[in-house]
Amino acid sequence: MQTRLGEKDINLPQYYNNRELSWLDFNYRVLQESYDKNNPLLEKLNFISIFSSNLDEFFMVRVAGLKDQVKMGYDKPENKAQMTPQEQLDAIKIKNTDYVNTQYQRYNELIKELANYDIEMVKPEDLSDALIEKLEQEFKLSVLPTLTPLGIDAYHPFPKLNNKSLNIFVDIDTEDAINSAIVQIPSLIPRFLTLNEGTKQYVVMVEDVITYFINYLFTGYEVLNTFTFRITRNADLTIHEDGAEDLLIEIERFLKERKSGSAVRLELDCRTSEKENVEWLINQLEIEDNDIYYLDGPLDLTFLFGLVDHLSHKLKYLTYEKYTPQPPRSLGNKNIYQLSLERDIFFHHPYESFEPIVDFIRQAADDPNTIAIKQTLYRVSKDSPIINSLKEAAENGKQVTVLVELKARFDEENNVHWARMLEDAGCHVIYGMTHLKTHSKIALVVKRINNELTSFVHLGTGNYNDKTAKLYTDMGIITTNKDIAEDAINFFNYLSGYSTKPEYNKLIVAPYDIRDVFIDRIDKEIRSHLQHGNGKIMMKMNSLTDKTIIEKLFEASQAGVKIQLIIRGICCLKPGIPGISENIEVVSIVGRLLEHSRIYYFHNNSEAHIYLSSADVMTRNMIKRVEILFPVEDKSIGQRLVNYMNLQLSDNQKGRYQDAQGLYHYVENNSSPLNSQSYLMQEAIKYGEELKKQSVQPSGQPVHSRRGGSWMRKLKNTFKR
């Protein structure tokens, strides 16, 4: 039965973007940053690398899942754009081929620009005899000992090649016959070698070096042909939770299995001419034409991360000017625990430092008045100071409970390591919940103050990861609100498995309630608008895929409610369609920092309801994850959030608006340039400088652009709260 609002059928596929194609469009917006004239050269190369890294995961998970559906004969269309799995795979191939070709065209342009700074990407045959001699020495010393040719014949079947591995196919004349072999390039050796001559530095890809000196591996035989190829495998395998006696052991089994999943993509150099060998390889990998990509340059451009890191020491002026996160405006120089007894404290990372959150746990671990610490961990850094503090707290006799989500994709191995280490230190470790991923960001510290127990709660939109907190925009609040403290205690009891679904005072928790609360809030906004004529909804998130909420937003738009959506990534809703979504606008901001915070605002006739959350409006977040949506009740913090969203909606440098056809366009620059991320960095720096000069919290007037302009005047005082 189709849902109808008014006379419009909102199930028509033309009102929706397909999830996978929308993600590819997001990844293209990442690639667009390599064209931005305001980005330094090395940062442009970084965006090309990010594009490739993103695409690897997309193929390992999303494409792999679609291919599995096709193999099982599943041909039911998805519920929004109504495309079957095979139709999606065909469309992905067309769109992604275009985007990848654009990526390599841009890569080759930027590599030519590098030559202006005496950095040249070359093949070994382009080097002088003296440099080839040096290269040969380096090859024999650092590369050759790591290589093992894998013969392919009756006694040597086709080898199990690792996921994302780079390999060289070799044909050898052994006199008796022409045989083949594969040389897998170890992932732990450098991807490129560098050679200096005068003022120039030459960069040579390791696969080109191995190919040039390939005879060292096949002494006595003639090498006839070689070509390089790369395999991507299915990493979207099933973790069997139901029958697992020990989830830790099951995860470790799963990690081994993932390395050799079925092949989902084969990448080849477009100059590869060995058609017969390529056909043989395709048959061995059991892939189809749709899975093959011919590339005009080195395979796997994620090597640019390492190249940029290598060159940034010499060419620092070709990177972003360093930014140091500043003291939080809500905290200033005050003690985090003392101040939180008086009022809620707001944090906006990475404009404001993540260090106070690290200190929040560190101080609790050291304080003899601390009774208990409870925390959820989804993704943490490899040398996490928070992990160290939790271990120290347990060793100091505190009651420490940590939920480590073992099923956090591509962080499983890291999380297994931390779970074992925390257990060894005496922490009570929860591995997660059956069939659910715990994606919530919450920490609870219980202290004895004046012979009474006081609970301090941190709630956030992003991970407790001190490394990504410098790159991802996220928000958090520390509060001693008694209702939220009680909710936090009940939440952790629920996670531990010793409680049925609690009744919460203020926290809203998925998989049970977040979707229902969103529906209720949208319905109330519709009623308020029909009565007062001022309905407005603003939402900021990473992705929007949940059809139930999209339909409700269509209904609100049809009722006249103004809806502004700031969605960095996937957006399955098409805005601006007359009679359906004409009152909805969608903007995506992709820039220096990765937009990661989730904010939900409902005007409610000037009695606004504002929430922060760990959850995007995706079906998986609504029904397959443990998420927290929490209210922002402090008026000054709420105003900061509203001002922040208005600022982002006014961004005419990094903002792209989606049209009714689902296409994204840069905002037309009809006013003074405004980059919301740069603006907030300037604001934070100014506050940090003022804080050094005075002990009282300053007013935090905005930094004026050198270009001035109306927007800078309008935004004066916007972020002073």
From Swiss-Prot:
SUPFAM superfamilies hit by this protein: Phospholipase D/nuclease, PHP14-like, PPK N-terminal domain-like
Top EC class of this enzyme: transferase
Domain PLD phosphodiesterase: 434-468
Organism: Staphylococcus epidermidis (strain ATCC 35984 / DSM 28319 / BCRC 17069 / CCUG 31568 / BM 3577 / RP62A)
Needed cofactors: Mg(2+)
Family: Belongs to the polyphosphate kinase 1 (PPK1) family.
One cellular component term from this protein's GO annotations in UniProt: polyphosphate kinase complex
Binding sites annotated in the UniProt record for Mg(2+): 379, 409
InterPro entries per record: PP_kinase, PP_kinase_C_1, PP_kinase_middle, PP_kinase_middle_dom_sf, PPK_C_dom2, PPK_N_dom, PPK_N_dom_sf
A single GO molecular function term of this UniProt record: metal ion binding
Gene Ontology biological process: polyphosphate biosynthetic process
EC number(s) on file: 2.7.4.1
Post-translational modification: An intermediate of this reaction is the autophosphorylated ppk in which a phosphate is covalently linked to a histidine residue through a N-P bond.
Entry protein name: Polyphosphate kinase
Function field: Catalyzes the reversible transfer of the terminal phosphate of ATP to form a long-chain polyphosphate (polyP).
Region (Disordered), start-end ranges: 692-721
UniProt: ATP binding residues: 54, 472, 568, 596
Active site: 439 (phosphohistidine intermediate)
Keyword annotations from UniProtKB, A to Z: ATP-binding, Kinase, Magnesium, Metal-binding, Nucleotide-binding, Phosphoprotein, Transferase
Catalysed reactions listed for this entry: [phosphate](n) + ATP = [phosphate](n+1) + ADP
